[in-house]
From Swiss-Prot:
Keywords: Dioxygenase, Iron, Metal-binding, Oxidoreductase. The gene is ectD. It is an enzyme of class 1 (oxidoreductase). It catalyses: L-ectoine + 2-oxoglutarate + O2 = 5-hydroxyectoine + succinate + CO2. This is Ectoine dioxygenase. The keyword Metal-binding applies. Homodimer. Its cofactor is Fe(2+). GO terms for molecular function: 2-oxoglutarate-dependent dioxygenase activity; iron ion binding. Binds 1 Fe(2+) ion. Fe cation binds at H180, D182, H281. Pfam families: PhyH (PF05721). It comes from Halomonas elongata (strain ATCC 33173 / DSM 2581 / NBRC 15536 / NCIMB 2198 / 1H9). SUPFAM superfamilies: Clavaminate synthase-like. Residues 1-47 are annotated as: Disordered.
Length: 332
């Protein structure tokens, strides 16, 4: 794992902000939700008194005996909010996935569809969503017990695929993505109630420092950073290209990165990155000639299925947020 931090000095242990109610009963803005209110308020018109709120759910709900991850791996996930496993896939299995990815990205009938996201200034497909419904190859991978078992172990319950996609960042042209917490979006716009989801990203090309690898803030999963700005109508049409709403403040980012640093897992194709739904992450532009691609699956716990969105007028389309056991089709 290649590690990049914001400075070379030792990083102190975070002293998390404690979310407490303000003493004034009629306070204009509260520091924490009252009992019965949304525990993770976001897309606010005005900031809270604190830059973040404590996470309420445990990070790891299962134990070593519950799945393939070792006690050391579970401890790392608990502490950092992610783990990286090199050589999770290799050989013919990896080659078959690369071949399928290239075939899907070349589909002209996908171009212009709502589930196919192109570069902000171009026509090249950047992401294909609901890929486990578009491809039998990726459907088998999404439901592979090697992934499902890890998700079940971390979540402490039966998972289902909340979202799937393949991402492609072309050489010299692939744009970056702002810092964000996936849970903030899924809570605000999909109606995911609690932090019982985990993401699995399998790198299908070599990941190195210069081709825009995913960067994460270790330890950031332990707090929730409310974001400012009311969710625009059909926000997903813009946010999947360039996200402007649901982005933490620079103050909060500066404090969290100063305390925890930044890590960017790199390595050969076939590695698996598992990260908590609330871990802050982002990526730089691809400044190298080498493309970067990955397969991405989000596993949500079945008893945490989505309800009405907490900070949007309506839920996002189903290709972005699946229901358990649903049968989605690109043809509706």
């Amino acid at each position: 794992m290649s590690v990049q931090t914001s400075s070379n000095r030792p990083l102190p242990q975070a002293n998390l902000h404690i979310a407490t109610e303000t003493p004034e009963a009629d306070s204009r803005i509260r520091s924490a939700p009252r009992p019965g209110q949304d525990p993770y308020p976001t897309r606010l018109s005005e900031p809270l008194d604190l830059p973040w709120l404590n996470r309420r759910e445990p990070v790891v709900k299962g134990e070593e005996a519950d799945g393939p991850l070792s006690a050391a791996q579970l401890d790392t996930f608990e502490r950092q909010g992610f783990i990286f496993e090199p050589d999770f896939l290799k050989g013919e299995e990896l080659e078959a996935l690369r071949h399928e990815l290239n075939a899907l990205l070349a589909r002209d009938d996908f171009r212009g569809r709502d589930f196919a996201i192109t570069e902000p200034q171009g026509n090249e497909i950047r992401s294909l969503f609901a890929v486990h419904y578009l491809s039998r190859v990726f459907s088998r991978l999404a439901n592979d017990e090697r992934l499902m078992g890890r998700a079940r172990q971390i979540l402490g319950g039966e998972p289902y695929v909340h979202q799937s996609r393949i991402n492609y960042k072309p050489g010299f042209e692939g744009k970056g993505f702002n810092w964000h917490s996936d849970f903030e979006t899924w809570h605000a716009e999909d109606g995911m109630p609690a932090m019982h989801a985990v993401s699995a990203s399998i790198v299908l090309t070599d990941n190195h420092t210069f081709n825009g690898p995913l960067m994460l803030v270790p330890g950031s999963h332990r707090v929730f950073v409310p974001c400012l700005g009311e969710t625009p109508e059909d926000h997903h049409r813009q946010s999947l290209k360039t996200q402007e709403f649901g982005v933490p403040s620079r103050q909060a980012l500066r404090e969290l990165i100063d305390r925890h640093g930044i890590e960017a897992p790199t390595g050969a194709a076939g590695g698996l990155l598992l990260f908590d739904c609330n871990t802050l992450h982002g990526s730089n532009a691809n400044m190298s000639p080498d493309p970067r691609s990955n397969a991405f699956f989000v596993y949500n716990r079945r008893d945490n299925r989505c309800v009405e969105p907490y900070a949007a007028s309506k839920r996002r389309p189903r290709f972005l947020a699946h229901e358990p056991d649903e049968a989605w089709s690109p043809d509706g």
